[in-house]
Amino acid sequence: MKYTKQNFMMSVLGIIIYVTDLIVDIWVSVRFFHEGQYVFSALALSFMLFGTLVAQCFSYSWFKADLKKAGQESQHCFLLLHCLQGGVFTRYWFALKRGYHAAFKYDSNTSNFVEEQIDLHKEVIDRVTDLSMLRLFETYLEGCPQLILQLYILLEHGQANFSQYAAIMVSCCAISWSTVDYQVALRKSLPDKKLLNGLCPKITYLFYKLFTLLSWMLSVVLLLFLNVKIALFLLLFLWLLGIIWAFKNNTQFCTCISMEFLYRIVVGFILIFTFFNIKGQNTKCPMSCYYIVRVLGTLGILTVFWVCPLTIFNPDYFIPISITIVLTLLLGILFLIVYYGSFHPNRSAETKCDEIDGKPVLRECRMRYFLME
C-alpha cells in the first residue's frame, strides 16, 4: 500500500480545514460574547471544548499504546502537549513530515519497494488513519451541535452576520471532509478491504451523509422552536439508545476499560446524527431500521408544526424549510441506495463475510475495530 502525492495533498487540505474550523468557532464565540449573547457564546465554546477534549483523550491514549507496543516508556511531553490541546497538531506534524518523504522523496511509481520504503508508507498510512478517526470524533461531537446552534440562531433572528454564515459553511465543509476522508482512510488502512476508487463513489457517499444529516438537523431546529425541553429529551433519548446499542454489540475498540466506555458514549452521540456500522457486521437490517425511524421522526416533527404552527416562528420560513427537509431526506436516501447498490466496493464480493472476522487479517490496525460505514 502506497502513500501517494494525492494522499499528501488531502492531508494538507485536512489540516487547513481543521485550523479554519477552529478559528471560526472561536471567532463566533467571541462575537456572541461581545454582542451580549452570553448563552450562545457559552454553548459555542462548550461544543468546541467537548469535541477537542475527547479527541485529545483518545490521541494521548493511542500515543501511550503505540509507545508501549514499541517497548518505549510514555513521555511526559506528550501528556503536556495534549493538556495544551496540541495533540492533533502534533499528529499532523508527524504525519505531514513523514508523509512528505513517502510521497515525494521515494518514487511512488516503483513497484519493487524495498522493506524500508514499505515500512515508511505503512507508518504514514497508520498515522493518517489515526488522524481521520480523531477528526471524525471531533467533527461530530463539535460540528453537528455547532451547526444546529447556528441554524437555530439564523432562523430565530431572520438574519445573521458574516461570522455565523462562515460558521455554517465551515461546519458543513468540516463534516463533509472528515466523513469522506475517514471513508478513504478506512479502506486504505485495511489491506483486506477494497479501495474506494474514483470520484463518483466518494461524491455519492458524501451526498448521502450530508443530505441525511442536513435534513435531520433542520428537523431538530424546528423541534427546538416548538419546545426546547422536548427537543433535548429526544436527543438524550436517542443518545441513550446509541450507547445501549454500542454495549449490546460489545465493541472492542480500546484496550482500556475506561476508554472503551468513553468510546461507546461517543458512538452513541454520533448515532444521533448518522448511521455507522459499529462492529463491522452486516448492517442491512440495522441501517434499514435506523433510516425508517429517521423518516418517521422527521415526518412527525413536520406534522406537529403544520398542525400547531407557532406564532413566534416566521411563517415565511416554514414552507421553504419544510420543502428543504423533505427534499434533502429523499435525496439522502436516494444517494444511500445508489452508493450501496452501485458503488460500494464490496457489492460484487462472491461471498458475504463478516467485516472483521470473515477474511484473513494481514496486519493489526486500530481502524479494524473502529466505526465501519
Swiss-Prot record:
Pfam families: XK-related. Signal peptide: none annotated. It is a multi-pass membrane protein. One of its GO terms (cellular component) is plasma membrane. The record marks 357-358 as: Cleavage. GO terms for biological process: apoptotic process. The chain crosses the membrane at residues 8-28, 38-58, 166-186, 203-223, 224-244, 256-276, 295-315, 318-338. Activated upon caspase cleavage to generate the XK-related protein 9, processed form. Does not act prior the onset of apoptosis. It is found in: Cell membrane. Keywords: Apoptosis, Cell membrane, Membrane, Transmembrane, Transmembrane helix. Belongs to the XK family. PANTHER family: XK-RELATED PROTEIN (PTHR16024), XK-RELATED PROTEIN 9 (PTHR16024:SF13). This is XK-related protein 9. It comes from Homo sapiens. The gene is XKR9.
